[in-house]
Amino acid sequence: IGIDGSFLKHKANGKEVVINMPMPTHKEAIKLVLDTLVSKENGVIKSMDEIDAVGHRILHSGESFTSSIVLTDETIAVCDSNSDLGPLHQKANLTGIAACRELMPNTPMVGVFDTTFHLTMPDYAYRYALPTEYYEKYKVRRYGFHGSSHRYVSAVAREYLGQGKGEK
């Protein structure tokens, strides 16, 4: 998005389609994805009404959310307040969410955070040996990332091993 050489790769019905097109904004890129999903030639759904909800991967929840959330004006504002914790990714995530909300105003949106999986760590594991002020004022702590992948892999591993949640 916003660079030369943008493309959308889409595979449907065993056929791969590559659309080379400038995508100067998140909104234009998401519109291209949505148009492709419903296109007569390469689509996989007949209409946008078939999309019941949209899930968004969001980098950082800080300590604000401990699980996935429904995205509302209020929860998005909280996500934005955590942007300083992930300055390279968080704003881009929120820009994509805003574009989806504009293009799909009646479709529920859900935020799934990279960091929530790791929020169960005890304080001795996530706190650094620094003055408490740094933790409280600047949110300096270990957060952990790629939590949605870790959650999935650990669930599949538990299933494979025949163990329930929380078993060791």
Each PLM stretch: what is its role?
Residues 21, 78-82, 134-138:
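Glycine-rich loops and low-complexity Gly/Arg-rich segments
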